[in-house]
């Protein structure tokens, strides 16, 4: 566990996301996309250079030194996003079986727990880049494919000591899909109960509406359930004029309140959070002052999330330095470990 407040240490763990590795996001690795107009993994894999570049990326973005670094800095939990194509090609997507097997071997070696996150469903669950394909939301047409993908992942990794849990969807679009999501969650939980070892978590997502989904699944004996909530505050100009302290007070009202109101009924994790502040707050600030502001907002958020079972920083690293790069924040002393 990463050192935070004393109460946070008692109640919850802190981990990181390994985003941008096995599911691409252009903003995280822009050099990979250089020379293409591709905005997502689907369009990138249809380019002439896609297949060769992605293979190199998968084999170099995360290496054993990264797993060692995590262990050396007391990061014992990672959330690992994958697409429905993780174990089987579905043109133009190429499977990541080799890298995923290796990731579990590394996690076992360094005693790190993996939350395996089905980040991208066939047909896209939200139409955004991190679902694999920008555009239409058509996952309901391919629901069985998603259930099959979950089952195959569970079958392959259920005996690994590193498997902490499986997350069945990431940030689904709620409008027009609420009833379908409840059905999918129930069906996915049924599938996983038939495969996973007792004690392995099934994790579902609240689609940014925790009060709506709290209690959506009732836990069966020996097969624990967690709800995943993500906390990203939109940055309207009005908020950007606030001090970081006042900005975080708004976060506290929204986030701590949501956790308090839902956690009694539905244990949860904060699957994604970060130190991101509106750029206007950091404009013309010396680097030392900027890092101090980021460090302070991180500590305030740690206190906000102490009622959650755990929290995963987005992201472990990106191509560039900055607020989404956990490793660089540790190495600059902004995050204390």
Mark where each language-model region is.
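Aromatic- and acidic-residue-enriched segments that line the glycan-binding/catalytic groove
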Residues: 26-39, 92-95, 123-141, 329-330
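Aromatic-rich peripheral "rim/lid" segments of glycoside hydrolase catalytic domains that contact
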Residues: 287-337
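Extracellular glycoside hydrolase catalytic/binding regions
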Residues: 155-158, 162-165, 169-303, 307
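Hydrophobic faces of well-ordered beta-strands that scaffold small-molecule active sites
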Residues: 12-18, 78-80, 114-118, 164-166, ...
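A short acidic, glycine-rich active-site loop
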Residues: 48-60, 134-144, 246-255, 291-292
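An active-site-proximal structural segment forming one wall of the substrate-binding cleft
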Residues: 55-78, 88, 92-120, 130-165, ...
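Short acidic/His/Gly/Ser-rich catalytic and metal-binding motifs that mark active-site loops
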Residues: 86-89, 122-131, 237, 277-280
């Amino acid at each position: 566990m990463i050192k935070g407040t004393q109460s946070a240490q008692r109640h919850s763990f802190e981990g990181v996301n390994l985003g941008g590795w096995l599911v691409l996001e252009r903003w995280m690795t822009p050099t990979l996309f250089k020379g293409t107009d591709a905005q997502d993994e689907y369009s990138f894999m249809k380019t002439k250079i896609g297949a060769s570049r992605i293979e190199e990326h998968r084999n170099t973005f995360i290496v054993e030194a990264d797993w060692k670094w995590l262990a050396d800095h007391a990061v014992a939990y990672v959330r690992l996003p994958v697409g429905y194509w993780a174990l089987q090609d579905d043109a133009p997507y190429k499977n990541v079986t080799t890298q995923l097997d290796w990731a579990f071997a590394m996690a076992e070696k360094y005693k790190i727990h993996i939350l395996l996150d089905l980040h991208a469903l066939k047909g896209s669950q939200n139409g955004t880049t991190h679902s694999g394909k920008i555009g239409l939301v058509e996952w309901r047409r391919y629901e069985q494919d998603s259930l099959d993908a979950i089952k195959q992942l569970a079958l392959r990794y259920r005996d690994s000591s590193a498997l902490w849990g499986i997350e069945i969807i990431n940030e689904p679009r709620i409008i027009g899909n609420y009833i379908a999501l409840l059905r999918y969650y129930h069906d996915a939980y049924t599938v996983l109960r038939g495969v996973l070892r007792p004690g392995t978590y099934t994790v579902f997502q609240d689609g940014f509406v925790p009060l709506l989904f709290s209690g959506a699944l009732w836990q069966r004996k020996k097969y624990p359930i967690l709800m995943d909530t993500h906390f990203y505050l939109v940055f309207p100009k009005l908020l950007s004029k606030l001090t970081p302290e006042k900005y975080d007070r708004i976060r506290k009202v929204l986030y701590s309140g949501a956790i308090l109101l839902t956690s009694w009924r539905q244990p949860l994790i904060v699957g994604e959070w970060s130190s991101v502040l509106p750029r206007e707050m950091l404009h013309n600030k010396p680097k030392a002052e900027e890092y101090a502001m980021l460090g302070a907002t991180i500590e305030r958020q740690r206190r906000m999330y102490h009622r959650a079972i755990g929290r995963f920083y987005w992201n472990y690293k990106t191509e560039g330095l900055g607020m989404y790069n956990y490793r660089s924040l540790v190495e600059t002393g902004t995050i204390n470990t």
